[in-house]
């Protein structure tokens, strides 16, 4: 297509242009095609064993993830995004079949969840989710969590506090506001994350075929009390800004 276009706008001419100029330009246009043909004939390049894109084993994933968590434990939350990005990259390089599992079967109804890997301060928590099963919206103690869809499809939603709120241990029904920051569909190999600074509440609903979800959590506090499910109002207070009224529901 490019060559035909070149012929149309710059035909050979005998009106003072140096001989061969048009021909040279046409040949240059063929170069990318030639390179592409050579690449196809040779096949895709092999990924070197020490490449940043080489597959990782389960042990390599765990070793690198834990080292990052130990280092971040000494740093401030301004480094959380870097940790999340590193963990996402490590997970992307690890075949889904090599990821840790708690071995529980997917139930016909509801979900089967629990820790599948403990590498303190890191922990993988796996959820086998029946079709339509829900992990209710909840917050977390200070942590960075990357959630991976390993099988099926799952709808993820993230929220943040909008304004002041009582402590999540205060279960007196007091209302406060939260803002929905993200809503996305995850398929196998896709991730979503939150840090201490953003998107700190999340919830999930499995698709029609169910799902396998793995949370890769890096805990940055010994605090185990600041966990609570969150109850949302039936309708948002502000549809455009995705602001909802909410209350803490405790751990059950």
Feature-to-residue mapping (PLM):
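Double-stranded beta-helix
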Residues: 201-252
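Conserved short histidine dyad/triad with adjacent acidic residue
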Residues: 125-139
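N-terminal secretory signal peptides
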Residues: 1-23
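Short beta-strand His + acidic residue motifs that chelate non-heme Fe in jelly-roll/DSBH
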Residues: 135-138, 156-157, 194, 200-206
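C-terminal segment of N-terminal export signals and the immediately downstream linker at the start
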Residues: 42-79, 236-237, 245-252
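Short acidic-glycine-tyrosine-enriched beta hairpin
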Residues: 163-196
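N-terminal export leaders
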Residues: 23-41
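Glycine- and acidic-residue-biased ligand/ion/polar-headgroup-sensing regions
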Residues: 142-144, 148-157
């Amino acid at each position: 297509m490019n060559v035909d276009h070149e012929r149309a706008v710059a035909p050979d001419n005998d009106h003072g242009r140096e001989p061969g100029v048009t021909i040279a330009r046409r040949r240059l246009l063929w170069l990318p095609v030639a390179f592409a043909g050579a690449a196809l004939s040779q096949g895709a390049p092999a990924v070197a064993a020490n490449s940043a894109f080489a597959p990782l084993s389960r042990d390599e994933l765990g070793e690198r993830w834990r080292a990052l968590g130990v280092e971040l434990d000494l740093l401030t939350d301004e480094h959380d995004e870097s940790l999340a990005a590193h963990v996402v990259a490590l997970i992307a390089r690890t075949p889904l079949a090599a990821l840790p599992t708690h071995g529980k079967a997917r139930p016909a109804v509801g979900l089967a969840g629990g820790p599948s890997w403990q590498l303190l301060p890191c922990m993988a928590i796996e959820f086998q989710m029946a079709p339509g099963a829900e992990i209710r919206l909840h917050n977390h103690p200070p942590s960075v969590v990357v959630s991976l869809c390993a099988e099926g499809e799952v709808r993820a939603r993230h929220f943040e506090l909008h304004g002041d709120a009582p402590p999540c241990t205060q279960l007196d029904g007091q209302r406060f506001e939260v803002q929905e920051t993200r809503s996305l569909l995850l398929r196998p190999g896709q991730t979503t994350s939150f840090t201490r600074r953003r998107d700190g509440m999340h919830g999930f609903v499995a698709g029609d075929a169910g799902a396998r979800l793995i949370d890769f959590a890096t805990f940055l506090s010994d605090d185990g009390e600041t966990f609570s499910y969150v109850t949302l109002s039936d309708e948002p207070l502000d549809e455009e800004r995705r602001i909802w009224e909410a209350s803490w529901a405790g751990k059950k």
